[in-house]
Amino acid sequence: MNNFIVFEGICCSGKTTTCNLLSKKINEIGEYKAIYNHGAMTYTDLGKKFKENLGKKDMPITVSYFFTDLIINTKNIIKPYLTDKHIIVLQDRYFDAITTYIKAYGDYIKTDYNIYDIPKALVKNDILINPSLNVFCIPPFKIIKERMAKSKESPVHDFYRDNPDFFKIVYNELVNKANESKENIIIDTSSDLSVEQGINKILEAIKK
């Protein structure tokens, strides 16, 4: 069963809203229970510190915080949930969101920050989990920029607003990652039709 569904996307891409819509649909059907779990930058003390440091500290420190936070969350939260075959975990960010961010930052400063091999190795060694399904929330960049301009103050959002060229590079890197596999579901969250079609595809995948 496809019970570990990961939603990836840049800030203000509509991940959380889409997760909530899907969660409601799953719970209405009644066969499974949907559990929402926030991935990168979790609600733990370490996750909160990671969020504060993102965009402020250099990338080696950022990467260390990220993988430590994600490994702990996988061990203590995700894996226990997945032992129950009646639970579907809707993961709001896993590893693609941050690895694309790091890679994009390297491109921005013209340095090789490609760390895509790290999560692959962690999945291979059963430390992280390979998602049953990857869902990328990617509305047009213009829409995300408009949403970001109205969004709350935070270290991550402020860094994007202060560095619009970097913001676009991150967006493009996520688009590239989304298009790597035909199995990925891409949702334009600015379109009600695209959201509806994407959710229906996910519901079909859950049944397999």
What is each PLM-predicted segment?
Residues I98-E173:
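A glycine- and Lys/Arg-enriched "phosphate-lid" helix/loop adjacent to the NTP-binding pocket
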Residues N37-D117:
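ATP-dependent small-molecule kinase phosphotransfer cores
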Residues K24-A34:
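Post-Walker A helix-loop "phosphate-sensing" segment adjacent to the P-loop in P-loop NTPases
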Residues C12-S13:
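ATP-binding Walker
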Residues S23-K25, K142-K208:
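NTP-dependent small-molecule kinase module
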Residues F7:
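Hydrophobic anchor at the beta1->P-loop junction of P-loop NTPases
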Residues T16:
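Walker A/P-loop
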